[in-house]
Amino acid sequence: MNRRRDRETERRRDGETKLRSIPPSLRLSVSLSLCLSVSLSLAALAQSGRTPVSGKRVTVVNVFAHRIEDPNQPRSLLSGDALKKEAEEKIIPKQVIEFYDGGVRQQIQAFSPDATPARIVVLMDNSLTLQSDTKKLAGVPAAFAPEIYEGDKVMVIGYDTKPEVITEFTDDPKQLQSTLSLLRKTDTPRLFDALNVVMEDVLRPEVGFSKRVIVVVGDGLDRDSKIKFDELLSKLQDENVTVYAIQVRDRTRGALRKDAPKPAEALKQLTEGTGGRIYSMDDDVKTSVKEICDELRNNRYQLTYYPEGINTINKRLLLISSSEASIQLRYKGWHPPHKM
């Protein structure tokens, strides 16, 4: 009996270590979310697409889709109901979409706009040698303050050798605009470990939200993370988390990395592998953040299907296309392999 009690104590200590970088108030939030996850299990199935439902495996792919407007066409002067009708006509129907999973054409069950609120984590490299000052870093969460839509919430986390919560999930502009004093540049960056903590302890409990987003602010450098890059990327893809990056100049100048991609390549794979995009810190950050928020609210669709004729032990490339040339599509590049 004593030995069993000791093992339980050790497990509790392990859990404490995992969340040590997150303050008590967030631990409470995570615990409550985990309890609620039982009631949200059906939503979890749709988001992860990894559990059979009624004998079939429901899978969801997040897609950014929009029509390219002809610049030569006159601007619409409609208002009220007429404007609403015009907006409805711009919605892209599933009939003009084709979808291939691992080279096998799939029957699309639904392709519909996702106007639900977003949960966005701004993950900022707070390490000593990053080629950017804290004032510029603080400008990123501040840029979200006027741009997030109703229901959206943003969390700010800084990382060096460990992640630390700067601002918990909030839609309060004052909190998002006052992170400068909480930033400090120290130590070395463990980006992959920080992303893993965000995935496991922050976004996984938020599985009821279909829009779970990470905005990485940094150059993509990782030093000595415990989790391997491929394992991390597979987790993000399985959970349908979208990664954006606001890229800082590479402090390594493209130097080769042992057992990890180069910094710029890491950001490229993280964004392309999850359907996100890369922006440059040298560009107007306010414009970049506005584009992120606008496309999350206005251009995000969910494609739902039951995979047929696929092999889950293989990496499966995804191909989504449209019969209409004016429609642009962006989505994660592939489903990761899974052992049987």
Regions found by a protein language model. Give the residues of each.
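Intrinsically disordered, low-complexity proline-rich regions
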Residues: R4-E16, I22-L42, L83-K84
